[in-house]
Amino acid sequence: MMTKIYRAGTLKRIRRTDAQLEQLDAQIFAVLKEDHPQSVLHVFYRMTDPRLPEPVEKSDKGYRHVQDRCVKLRRSGRVKYNWFADLSRRGYFTNTYSSAADFVTSVAGLYRADLWRDADTRCEVWSESRSIASVILNDCKKLAVDLYPCGGFSSLSFIHEAATSINNSGDVRPLQVFYIGDYDPAGVLIDKSLERELREHLRSRVELRFERIGINAGQIEQYGLPTKPRKESDKRSLHIGCAVEAESLPAKTLRGILRDKVEALLPENALAVAKVAEESELQQLELMARMFATPWPLDDDEADAADDE
């Protein structure tokens, strides 16, 4: 069965009434409450479902409308800001601490046990866009895998830096890379270019295993993903007859696919074992912080010097 290709309609959309806007807002709220964080583009694709009471059109105009409602929902306080994922803008900070105890307390929460110590492979996740990366970031953190957003065709320096990190690690286990990107004439070339460049820079002893886990042709049919006609001017990948953005796959589904793939590489009960180890080590770090916070007793000479002052 062929997936239907949606083309821009010719009918002019009538301005929504207050009741229709309220219904659209309710739909957006429900989607985000059920699963977050999501990018605005993920929410937009959910709002194009014709089965909804108030769907939006599959067009740039429809996206801008959803984007506008998402802004209003955040500003009104109806939707939490952190329900939206956005890695496109980040600040750069220098952390400072009031004391050694403050430092130990602050960094204790960053401690992670090595989930991959006894695994047969290493694992990384690459995504075509920061939009996708922002949605899967928390899962990558929980699973202790590095995440690299390409931003389209990735820069050679970015790939070289990632490969150099692998080469310098001293880890001789195979490297599994999972990739997520758009299925369109350009998108199906990005992961091929990435894999080729990684192989170019990785040392020969590093066995690279590369798998595109989304979006692929089978998923378009399996999940009934909305498609767009390919640009007639684009002469790349002529065997690709349509365009499907990675964000058209519901964020919850995408995260589930990723977790299943990554967890299959981990030893049995690795997450549970690591959690127990982390709790024990965190207790030691907390004890260390208390030791730094407690003034050390002065010896006799130090006490006399303090009295003289």
Describe every region a protein language model picked out:
Residues 1-175, 188-309:
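Nucleic-acid enzyme cleavage-core boundary/entry regions
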